[in-house]
Amino acid sequence: MFTLDGDSSDYFDDDLGDLGVDRPSDATDPDTPPPAKRRRLRAGKDASNADLQSHQKPRAERGDGARTALSSDSFIDYDDDEVPSPERESPYFQDDSEREARSKYKVFAPKNANIQENIFVTQLTQPPSPPEMLRGPRWKKPDPGLPTRTVATPLPETTQSRESAAGDRDDEYDDDEEMKAAIEASLQSFEEETSRPAPSVPLQKPPSSTPIIGQQSTTIEASNDLLDDIPDDAFDSDLSMSPPPAPQPRPAARSFTQSTNRPLGVRQTTLFGMVARNPENQPPRGEQVYSPPEKSEPPTQHKLNQEALGTWVYPTNLGKTRDYQFNIAQKGLFHNLLVALPTGLGKTFIAATIMLNWFRWTKDAQIVFVAPTKPLVAQQISACFEVAGIPRSQTTMLTGEAAPGIRAEEWKAKRVFFMTPQTLINDLKTGIADPKRIVLVVVDEAHRATGGYAYVEVVKFLRRYNQSFRVLALTATPGSTVESVQAVIDGLDISRVEIRTEQSLDIREYVHSKDTDVQTFQNSEEMVLCMDLMSKALQPLLDQLRSTNAYWGRDPMGLTAYGLTKARQQWMLSDSGRNAHFGVKAKMNAIFTVLASLAHGIDLLKYHGITPFYRHLLHFQSNTEGQKGGKYQRQVVQDESYKKLMNHLQPWTKNPEFIGHPKLEYLKQVVLNHFMDAGEGSGADENKDQPATRVMIFVHFRDSAEEVTRVLKRYEPMIRPHVFVGQSSAKGSEGMGQKTQLDIVQKFKKGTYNTIVATSIGEEGLDIGEVDLIVCYDSSASPIRMLQRMGRTGRKRSGKITLLLMQGKEEESYIKAKDNYEKMQQMIASGTRFTFHDDMSPRILPPGVRPVADKRAIDIPEENTVRDLPEPKRRGRAPKRPPKKFHMPDNVETGFTTASHLAGTSKRRVPNKSKARTPTPEPVELPALEDVLLTPAQQKELELHYSNAGPSEELLVSYPRSDAFPRLQLAPRPTKAVRHGSLTRRMIETLQKMDQITPDCGDRYKGILAREKASMPKASIVAPKPNGRGEAQSRTKARHTSKVVSSKSRNQEEQDVTEVQRTPPGKHSVSATNAEVEPFYCSQRTQDGDTDDDFDLPDVSTLLNRSVERPSTRGRFVLDDSDD
């Protein structure tokens, strides 16, 4: 049983049905079965009927005689009719007189079971409220006790009308007056709430319940006998269950966390397709005024035109202003915006408007529009020329075909650029384009901006050098998953999203209806025959895979290239694959390769036709001619089933009338019927510039496109088809260049071709024109591709979409894509699942500047009337490519920087490696002799304690005597286990030098000084610096001589010392030649030039250390011959 308020009927039925219903069958017509919820109340209630009848006889008298007294005991009299309204609380059972005067509401019990089919109000919309709060009835009769806000009816009149309304219940049931009144009130409420900008406040304010209870105290006492077994709160309405509805629902709804980036124009519908009126989620009607956000950021480096900053221009050249275009364009000026609009709703116009205003606001900044293909770029150029009025002289179109030198000149001279993203990133990396000059980047088909696509690289590169630029992203389908949409937002630094669907309220008047016809097909007899023969040919190879547990499928017709690739990877990673012999691995890889190549042919047979399947088998067979092909490939070709299959296919494909797929047959009929209904026959409309209608057919493979074109060409000139494919060349099919693509699009618009058979190249963005019929020859599991295909029609007039699907996988893919699209649209519209980059969206405009909209018709310059694309002209000799230029970001530190500075760590001071100069020793003052010698007491103590070996023997320890054995001390004595130490050798060398000194040493020394002074000039002699090679060798000679002496063997040392002792004194003199060659030092010369005999002799250290400065390098050892 349903009421006008489906939400609350069950609640009141449960409370009242359990307590006050004796015989539910009396509530409705005897022919009508009782409701299921009341059926359980029939038993166990007859005992109380007698007691209740005495109280309810007056109620039965109000009937027309057809109803018995027991009918007043039915549930209807005590159901919602007895439920008080939320505005007051009152007892339900009163005495008979008062009950007769106060007729309450009732539950509508239809006599016919199908009465619900005529009720279109199944779920009334509600103001926002939390789900846990119970809501009262949506519509009630006016309360006679309290005046309403809208209609102030006197109480007696209301009571009288209600008495009359309650007088004849059977008439009310038959004529459904209550239901009509409810429907009219619901429609009136719907219109009122639709016109309100905010949720309506309840019409009546519930007064205090105490006065009402006081006024009816006698009635409560009279009915106590009926309420003894009923709880006090049994008949409480939702007012007692929940707070008053006026203030509570609004704050409760706002307490939920919702995104501030909620887009406009998104409406929520119920399960029955009705609109859920939540004013907070609805877009504001009409045009809105947005201002740039106030941000604290450094001033922009772009030179701004202060005179133009006060306004932003909205072109009105196209006629009527669309509110959604106005609002989106205004928001796109001040935020990094992602615009998701269905195809044909003016994304190009929005982009042209934003480009025009940034062109006005800046003096020399550059604006870049990027699109994946050249046809999409050319399409935007026409919009900027014809709508926005951007001068052609400031515009250029750059692609990879232009030489780098020409592109460099264009970057210096122009301000607006239309190009592909690959060309833009190349110019940025080579320094041809200055990233600091770019102020706006418009990205078309923005759903591609994921991963490492060129769109993402462009934005990242610009962000390194420029923090003051705007991004506008345009797409019809942002993505198929939450992750893909978030990747687009992250890759382009998006801060706001504006999304519209075809059900959005503000675009409904601009969207034409699209009639979608889905046709499913089964395999034909020819296809079943081909599948059986192909399965027999492939079964042996499949069994070999299954025997090694490399593949689990049994049906060869279920093979797919992706499934075989995954199975190969899993087998190679398994233990059996890793431990298998090399020959087994080669065998498995060969079988997987052969089956994967034939899996594509199986897909062609299933979904595209027999002719593409036959072409694929011919190509597969050609690889086995001669010595080509592997063992398993030749095994398939030589199989009897395969040969039989080819014998069947060859005559079929040679027949020009053969149609190898049921979808192709139906496609031919659909296209023919469409053109015949449009009145385009063989001789019709030949004088018109444009045909009456156009058709576009989407296929997945080029083979299918060629087959469809071949079939449709039989019906020329009514059907004039042409293939529309991409640039890359494939086997048996040459690609189309971008110029060829543009030429085909222009001929399609003019009417040279009225049917285009396109692959995926025709899905995205192309303004191909007014297409009245879209035929999807195969389905796509991607919702992006599906929606792109369907968006080609229904732009300016109603369109039709025909989907041709095979039962099974293809049909499931379509359902999956459709559901995925609807779910993603809701997620994107809510905005709660995504993270936006508001910090990456700069204000750019100076603080305090708030541009005002200026709607006006733009004057189109005469130069824009030229139809050619603004490509740079080719020259006989292109300019030389400029050298690479490295642009630096602002506030960059040039020069070399240490790694410790970049890492932020402190740099350790490295000590200076230069040796400190040894200070000159100061002469020590010689102490007195008495201070050095021992005193008599100390001498006595030395002799007593240290010199005496013991008291028994007179053995005294004496000092070492250097004169006891003078000859033996000049040479080291023989040793056995312990060798002489360094001190012993130094002592021996010292004694040897002392022994070499003769009594005439002083005389010889004075003679040398005299000769030296006589041979030198009178000027003061300065010690020369050792700067020559010979000087270095002479200085190192003495050092090496001493090392050689110290490194001699013990026997050799003794022999040398013995010879020195036996040498006469005269032979120990230094040779005169060496004395004259070696320089004298300052300590060896006199300052006043006198050479008398009483001069001071140099000290011993000066004599021994002849070299003041020791060279760092060692010279060769030179042994002087004593005979020289």
Curated annotation (Swiss-Prot):
- Gene Ontology MF term list: 3'-5' DNA helicase activity; ATP binding; ATP hydrolysis activity; DNA/RNA helicase activity; flap-structured DNA binding; four-way junction DNA binding; four-way junction helicase activity
Main location as per UniProt: nucleus
Q: Where in the cell is it found?
A: Nucleus
Q: Which domain of life is it from?
A: Eukaryota
- Region feature (Disordered): 1-103, 123-302, 855-923, 1016-1124
Q: How does it assemble?
A: Interacts with the MHF histone-fold complex to form the FANCM-MHF complex.
- The protein's role, per its UniProt record: ATP-dependent DNA helicase involved in DNA damage repair by homologous recombination and in genome maintenance. Capable of unwinding D-loops. Plays a role in limiting crossover recombinants during mitotic DNA double-strand break (DSB) repair. Component of a FANCM-MHF complex which promotes gene conversion at blocked replication forks, probably by reversal of the stalled fork.
Q: What is this protein called?
A: ATP-dependent DNA helicase mph1
**Protein's organism:** Aspergillus niger (strain ATCC MYA-4892 / CBS 513.88 / FGSC A1513)
